[in-house]
Amino acid sequence: MPTDAKRPLQLNDQGQLRHFISLDGLPRELLTEILDTADSFLEVGARAVKKVPLLRGKTVCNVFFENSTRTRTTFELAAQRLSADVISLNVSTSSTSKGETLTDTLRNLEAMAADMFVVRHSDSGAAHFIAEHVSPNVAVINGGDGRHAHPTQGMLDMLTIRRHKGNFEQLSVAIVGDILHSRVARSNMLALKTLGCPDIRVIAPRTLLPIGLEEQYGVRVFTNADEGLKDVDVVIMLRLQRERMQGGLLPSEGEFFKLYGLTEKRLKLAKPDAIVMHPGPINRGVEIESAVADGAQSVILNQVTYGIAIRMAVLSMAMSGQNTQRQLEQEDAE
């Protein structure tokens, strides 16, 4: 199954978003357009009636082959706020459990006139495979595929950073934890690099670091958390993904917390105004202590709010191209 989701598949002939599979190969201008569009949609969430008619008459189908309450719920809410009809497929009770292929399942859904699929799958490359096999008028959004990519999470993290820190050109950002199994880490590294962040630091035990990070993403790698966190502006903590680990990668969760967990004491190594992020779900006392997760520097709940706006931006842009902001302005004027 292919795992490389480069520009020709994701963009149409005019350079507008067609599918959203990975941040790899997407230009800085497009990522900025997504962030700007999401900024516009944040205002919609503050309205008494939290809806705009940009996707009225369209059907968005959430096809989650891997559980994720947060991602599925925010995609549902994003589609509903755009006035789309929403179908969420419970895969555990679907025909795939009876031996039906992924392609057959999607063909049946297409027969129901779905305009867009939001797909989450445990196999890397699944979203790319689906995008290659759907009808030309159907858009595919990757809700997370294996270790490969989680592009909307990457973009909501970028929106969080931009709203709290301004531009990216003078920031130091640390990504801490289970890098090896994290599609979020990969999407964040790609987004930060594309948006011009000059100092991307990756902090993890050697057993949880993929080979070749420095060359592929232009990051600095640290196995000592105290050294890596010194004077950073942003700290992104990652969950230990025990369900994806083979034995022997870690001595214990307690040992991991001792060496890499974000405590109040360790956070003081970062800049005084550093922000703390986490894609969730949080393992308190494993990668982060409660005093930090709930503290004044935490923007974890903001990430959830911004996630709805980012997903609204991606859904609307994939359906209508990069004129979403103009359409939204026209709706406001009427």
Curated annotation (Swiss-Prot):
<dbReference type="GO" id="GO:0006520">
    <property type="term" value="P:amino acid metabolic process"/>
</dbReference>
<keyword id="KW-0665">Pyrimidine biosynthesis</keyword>
<feature type="binding site">
    <location>
        <position position="120"/>
    </location>
    <ligand>
        <name>carbamoyl phosphate</name>
    </ligand>
</feature>
<dbReference type="InterPro" id="IPR006132">
    <property type="entry name" value="Asp/Orn_carbamoyltranf_P-bd"/>
</dbReference>
<feature type="binding site">
    <location>
        <position position="183"/>
    </location>
    <ligand>
        <name>L-aspartate</name>
    </ligand>
</feature>
<dbReference type="InterPro" id="IPR036901">
    <property type="entry name" value="Asp/Orn_carbamoylTrfase_sf"/>
</dbReference>
<dbReference type="Pfam" id="PF02729">
    <property type="entry name" value="OTCace_N"/>
</dbReference>
<dbReference type="GO" id="GO:0044205">
    <property type="term" value="P:'de novo' UMP biosynthetic process"/>
</dbReference>
<feature type="binding site">
    <location>
        <position position="280"/>
    </location>
    <ligand>
        <name>carbamoyl phosphate</name>
    </ligand>
</feature>
<keyword id="KW-0808">Transferase</keyword>
<dbReference type="GO" id="GO:0016597">
    <property type="term" value="F:amino acid binding"/>
</dbReference>
<comment type="function">
    <text>Catalyzes the condensation of carbamoyl phosphate and aspartate to form carbamoyl aspartate and inorganic phosphate, the committed step in the de novo pyrimidine nucleotide biosynthesis pathway.</text>
</comment>
<feature type="binding site">
    <location>
        <position position="150"/>
    </location>
    <ligand>
        <name>carbamoyl phosphate</name>
    </ligand>
</feature>
<feature type="binding site">
    <location>
        <position position="70"/>
    </location>
    <ligand>
        <name>carbamoyl phosphate</name>
    </ligand>
</feature>
<protein>
    <recommendedName>
        <fullName>Aspartate carbamoyltransferase catalytic subunit</fullName>
        <ecNumber>2.1.3.2</ecNumber>
    </recommendedName>
</protein>
<comment type="pathway">
    <text>Pyrimidine metabolism; UMP biosynthesis via de novo pathway; (S)-dihydroorotate from bicarbonate: step 2/3.</text>
</comment>
<feature type="binding site">
    <location>
        <position position="239"/>
    </location>
    <ligand>
        <name>L-aspartate</name>
    </ligand>
</feature>
<dbReference type="GO" id="GO:0005829">
    <property type="term" value="C:cytosol"/>
</dbReference>
<feature type="binding site">
    <location>
        <position position="98"/>
    </location>
    <ligand>
        <name>L-aspartate</name>
    </ligand>
</feature>
<feature type="binding site">
    <location>
        <position position="71"/>
    </location>
    <ligand>
        <name>carbamoyl phosphate</name>
    </ligand>
</feature>
<feature type="binding site">
    <location>
        <position position="281"/>
    </location>
    <ligand>
        <name>carbamoyl phosphate</name>
    </ligand>
</feature>
<comment type="similarity">
    <text>Belongs to the aspartate/ornithine carbamoyltransferase superfamily. ATCase family.</text>
</comment>
<dbReference type="GO" id="GO:0006207">
    <property type="term" value="P:'de novo' pyrimidine nucleobase biosynthetic process"/>
</dbReference>
<dbReference type="InterPro" id="IPR006131">
    <property type="entry name" value="Asp_carbamoyltransf_Asp/Orn-bd"/>
</dbReference>
<dbReference type="Pfam" id="PF00185">
    <property type="entry name" value="OTCace"/>
</dbReference>
<dbReference type="InterPro" id="IPR006130">
    <property type="entry name" value="Asp/Orn_carbamoylTrfase"/>
</dbReference>
<comment type="subunit">
    <text>Heterododecamer (2C3:3R2) of six catalytic PyrB chains organized as two trimers (C3), and six regulatory PyrI chains organized as three dimers (R2).</text>
</comment>
<feature type="binding site">
    <location>
        <position position="153"/>
    </location>
    <ligand>
        <name>carbamoyl phosphate</name>
    </ligand>
</feature>
<dbReference type="GO" id="GO:0004070">
    <property type="term" value="F:aspartate carbamoyltransferase activity"/>
</dbReference>
<dbReference type="InterPro" id="IPR002082">
    <property type="entry name" value="Asp_carbamoyltransf"/>
</dbReference>
